[in-house]
Amino acid sequence: MKLNQIKEVMRKYGKAWEKQNVSLILDCFTSNGIYQESPLSKSYKGHKEIKKFWENTVLKDTKNIHFKFGNCYISKDGKTGFAEWNCTNLYRGKKNKMAGIMILKMKGNKISYLNEYWNTQVDK
């Protein structure tokens, strides 16, 4: 894994969120990739499950998304990537400010495993 692979997939991932583009998010993942949206939430395995999650949650409940990735890192053994990110959005009509980090495993230029850890501040 190389740093530029992580940065490129993060650009595409952020664009997919901002454009709410299911095809683009699926293009970030291998066909059997795992998307763990949060450590305590259900994991989505493969394009079919990821697409269903996006259609039922992201497209339905989330609007006005602005995504920015920050620093990216690679583990010493080169097998795991990490990426910081920030996001603002409207989720079910409420303004959110989010900050998080992703743990990534890659196969080529696609994500084979992604686990996000994030925190949300909701405007009142």
Region roles according to the model:
Residues Y13-A16, Q36, N89:
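Alpha-helix C-capping/helix-to-loop hinge sites
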Residues N32-I34, K110:
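Structural motif
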Residues M1-S31:
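Short, low-complexity N-terminal intrinsically disordered segments enriched in polar/charged residues
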Residues K2-Q5, K51-K124:
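A beta-strand edge to alpha-helix "cap/lid" segment located at domain peripheries
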Residues I34-K45, V58-T62:
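A short gly/proline-enriched turn/hairpin at secondary-structure junctions
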Residues S23, H47-K48:
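Residues in well-ordered alpha-helical elements
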